[in-house]
Amino acid sequence: WTKEDGWKDARIVPEGPITMDPACVTLHYAQETFEGMKAYRTAEGKIQLFRPEMNAKRMINSNARLCMPEFPVDMFVEAVKALVKVEEDWVPSEPETSLYIRPFMFATEAALGVHMASAYKFMIICCPVGAYYAEGINPVKILVEDELVRAVKGGTGFTKCGGNYAGSILGQVKAEKMGYSQVLWLDGEHRKYVEEVGTMNIMFKIAGEIY
């Protein structure tokens, strides 16, 4: 994407290293976003995606917060489907396995100084994966983090950008050293209200009600 031409030159190429200028805006000011989704192979051998348009819409919201151009929903879904079609032999069929798909977008302009970049790339990589946790689908131990915070009101907590995850690594390392698999983050102001768990959804069943 460039200011002059918009999105252009879509293509599928073999995976390999990419070249970046040392002054690339992304390396200094973290103007990048990403998504995470999976393709599954059914018992009948059919390959299925789960609501890819929702991932596309979430990326649009993330991009807006970071002053990055919108990548249209139809182009996003088309790109994902095209890549999965090419790599369909890599979609595993064993229980608890899938093809992990990582769409991401980043600024490519080479310039120092905080500003909205004038050029971006949207890319997708993928690979077969097993269960995310060593415990599989069994219960995992979660540490309630009451010192560090992941998101604050008015911040970027609702976006999928690298800075959010870089800021959460210290809490994750702390949890793992104590024998936990993940972190339950509390609110940034009072440190007592449940916000989220780092890599999964969370819900509570209280007196028969699901929250």
Segments predicted by a language model, with ranges:
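Helix-start/capping segments and mature chain N-termini
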Residues: 1-83, 112-211
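Short, glycine/charge-rich beta-strand/loop segments that flank catalytic centers
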Residues: 72-83, 92-109
